[in-house]
Design a protein with these regions (language model features):
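Extended, histidine- and acidic-residue-enriched regions that form the cofactor-binding/catalytic faces
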Residues: 6-129, 137-293
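Conserved SAM-binding loop
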Residues: 132
């Protein structure tokens, strides 16, 4: 599926037509950038993780999920919507999973520098809008640090977007999130029913349901004992995954189905496409200069 974010091209030009351009940054040719309507184009940087996800899921879960959400969004993007998806940054910030074999992680300062330098390269191409699309809960704070710095230094319009916070409704507006219990939404935060369902929809051959179970979280124990410490909002534990469950997973993975996962992916894809459309419609004065009173 192509996009239309070209300026008017000269007559008899060998440059591609708007509809012929791909959606992925790396698939463009260098001369294409000379005719991009860079003031409208939205660059999307997917950031994920390579980390353990219990005994039943592969290390690539977060990377697979963010790319699956993008794929689900593509059919809902208008050809008039100028969006370019940058290469997925698969390795992220995952120190909370380092006690489990296979986890790859970078230091916080490395991640900040990496994402910042990629954004600087995007800005050097003339693009003025950037979305940091994240699928890993352990690096949410780093997105905000990078986004605010880019706004302050480069004047970029930057949005931090976490795929797991996108609205979850079907085409009729009914809740897709209701497939899962409130308990699962709160405590099944890693390799539980939600992520396992999505992986069954995307890469079923990599899911070992024989090893999936209802993985208990010690977070539930604290919630039952402490009214403030356990409310999930007032205080945040600096945790390692084994603090929650020795298997490195929490939530009822045994209840996962591909059907639930497909519905989630479609809902996230629709929401992402709508979000990008809304960013495109923002007024030019969304970012403003300071003025003296």
């Amino acid at each position: 599926m192509g996009l239309k974010c070209l300026q008017n091209k000269p007559m008899n030009s060998d440059l591609p037509s708007a509809a012929a351009l791909p959606r992925y940054w790396a698939d463009l040719k260098s001369p294409d950038f000379a005719v991009l309507d860079s003031s409208r184009c939205i660059a999307v940087l997917p950031v994920a993780a390579i980390e353990q996800h219990g005994p039943h899921l592969p290390l690539n879960v977060d990377t697979t999920l963010v790319e699956g959400v993008i794929a689900a969004a593509l059919p809902h993007l208008s050809t008039d919507l100028p969006v370019l998806f940058l290469p997925t940054q698969a390795v992220g910030f995952s120190p909370e999973h380092t006690r489990f074999a296979g986890t790859l992680t970078l230091k916080a300062e490395t991640i900040i520098r990496l994402w910042t330098e990629l954004a600087e390269a995007v800005a050097a191409s003339g693009v003025k809008k950037l979305v940091l699309l994240n699928s890993h809960g352990g690096q949410v704070g780093l997105l905000d640090v990078v986004a605010r710095d880019l706004r302050a230094r480069l004047g970029l319009l930057v949005y931090s977007v976490n795929s797991f916070n996108l609205p979850l409704t079907d085409e009729q507006g009914a809740s897709v999130a209701s497939q899962f219990s409130a308990h699962e939404h709160r405590f099944g935060i890693h390799a539980g029913e939600i992520e396992t369902s999505m992986m069954l929809a995307l890469k079923p051959a990599q899911v070992d349901m024989a090893k999936a179970q209802n993985f208990h979280s010690t977070s539930q124990d604290r919630a039952e004992r402490f009214s403030i410490l356990g409310d999930g909002r007032s205080a945040k534990l600096a945790w390692q995954m084994q603090d929650y469950n020795a298997y490195g997973a929490v939530g009822n993975a045994a209840a996962a189905t591909a059907e639930k996962g497909h519905a989630l992916l479609q809902a996230m894809g629709r929401s992402l496409a709508q979000l990008l459309g809304e960013i495109d419609q923002l007024p030019p004065d969304t970012l403003r200069s300071a003025t003296a009173s």
